[in-house]
Design a protein with these regions (language model features):
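Helix-loop element at the rim of GNAT/NAT acetyltransferase active sites that forms part
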Residues: 8, 19-48
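Acyl-donor (CoA/ACP) binding surface of acyl/acetyltransferases
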Residues: 1-23, 70, 74-182
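Active-site rim helix/loop that mediates acceptor-substrate recognition in acyltransferases
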Residues: 37-67
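A general structural signal marking secondary-structure boundaries and capping sites
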Residues: 24-25, 61-65, 175
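Short, contiguous strand/loop micro-motifs
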Residues: 27-28, 45, 62-63, 104-105, ...
Length: 182
């Protein structure tokens, strides 16, 4: 696999994120949830944002380290970003996420991108942990997180997805765990 790197976008690169959020295949994992989020379509999982809303989002998210970080994922052999990673402080825990554009899924990008995010979070920004809550039926996602050093904790959430109960569990990696792996 080619070299992966993370790059914080400039304001003129917001259209990538805006397009991914509208893409049915990229956002299909997000469908069925009862989210109170402006622009969210429960049937498709897509999220629609105006240009003005994207600029407001950008001003709230970009260059807010160490508590908030957002970057695009790049493969040096591909001219445009293939996805995004982020984390943010949420009740004393840094919640995080990763999104790979649909056409690049299944190629190992998640694992390598998680390693890059860990390096920035723990080595550059000195945060103590990264955490995500992932539905147990997303086996490939869980596999990538565990390969990158995350472990399941006892914290779980039950959510309704299209009226059916879904269980999601926390995956967590601490700075100490990260340092022991390196």
């Amino acid at each position: 696999m080619s070299k992966i790197y993370l790059k914080v976008p400039n304001i003129h690169e917001l259209y990538y994120r805006q397009e991914w959020m509208k893409d049915l295949k990229t956002m299909s994992y997000n469908s069925g949830y009862d989210m109170d989020l402006k622009g969210y379509n429960k049937q498709t999982g897509t999220i629609t944002r105006t240009d003005e809303e994207m600029i407001t989002w950008y001003n709230n998210w970009i260059n807010k380290e160490p508590d908030r970080y957002f970057a695009y994922i790049y493969d040096k052999d591909i001219e445009e970003p293939i996805g995004e990673v982020y984390y943010y402080l949420n009740n004393d825990v840094h919640s995080m996420g990763i999104l790979i554009q649909n056409k690049y899924r299944g190629k190992g990008y998640s694992y390598i991108s998680l390693l890059e995010l860990e390096k920035i979070a723990f080595e550059k920004n000195g945060i103590n942990e990264l955490s995500d809550i992932i539905p147990l039926d997303r086996m490939n996602t869980i596999k990538s997180f565990k390969k990158a050093g995350f472990i399941h904790t006892d914290l779980e959430q039950k959510e309704l997805v299209f009226g059916k109960e879904s269980i999601a569990k926390q995956l967590l990696i601490t700075r100490e765990m990260y340092m022991e792996m390196r």
